[in-house]
């Protein structure tokens, strides 16, 4: 059974669900899920949880996302991208200073209405399904945050502009194109969209479906991955970092055996001397590196695996309802909450043998 995360570089022309289906087939597994949805016409980072890692999806931070995209001015479409029908046109060609002035209104906390063709749920149904059936879709605007929005290229001949953006969760790039076009009175839609970051998942550490189909993805080696301290230690000649907490005391180094290849101390993929990249799985422990970890005994682990609550000493730093991960050695046991002095299992990992 494969358990861990995959930092997938999704190609264009494939939905997020289709990407997950292909990954299931490649790894021969039945359970997988993705963190955040990426439009079929978009490419880039789509983190995919495999096996028991699917239980960690709600606990992974994806508050920061990064995108590169191109807007074509002069046309607004039903889908706010190339795939829709044209509904409004304009002959206006916005100038460099006009665009730079307009994008200032899109930085910070803004109110944004998702596209009609989006995965937003309306009374239990996806908005895009309602829109495709011809129903009128009424999507409520919501507050989102844009940390950075820059125009990096303007082609006045072809009437297109390239942008880079760092934003919070829930932002629709297609809505940015739509609203910016309306602001400039020239209309606009997305022609290219690429996501380069989702939380800790970065573009330069990703893998493509083509790479996965060519390489052996189930070869193990004793290489190591990071957890969450600034303490460095060598493992098989590679500088790595990692530590775990034992009863709330960070006093031991924890080295995590992972698939060959592993990650570097900076989080990037490593390759063996022959350049044969064999392993792309990020262990559950590493994906949860920002979550507080507490080591427990095998006896305590068995109780938690059965859904029983336990009492642990020396958890004074935890507040009521704090979430943390219990581990035995380097093996995650469960995501737990600290409730009125008890350690209560929320999601138990079926990994420990």
UniProtKB/Swiss-Prot annotation:
GO terms for molecular function: RNA binding; tRNA pseudouridine(55) synthase activity. Gene3D superfamilies: Pseudouridine synthase. Keywords: Isomerase, tRNA processing. Its EC number is 5.4.99.25. The active site is at residue 39. InterPro entries: PsdUridine_synth_cat_dom_sf, PsdUridine_synth_N, tRNA_psdUridine_synth_TruB, TruB_C. PANTHER family: PSEUDOURIDYLATE SYNTHASE TRUB1, TRNA-PSEUDOURIDINE SYNTHASE. Belongs to the pseudouridine synthase TruB family. Type 1 subfamily. This is tRNA pseudouridine synthase B. It comes from Wolbachia pipientis subsp. Culex pipiens (strain wPip). The lineage of its organism: Bacteria, Pseudomonadati, Pseudomonadota, Alphaproteobacteria, Rickettsiales. The gene is truB.
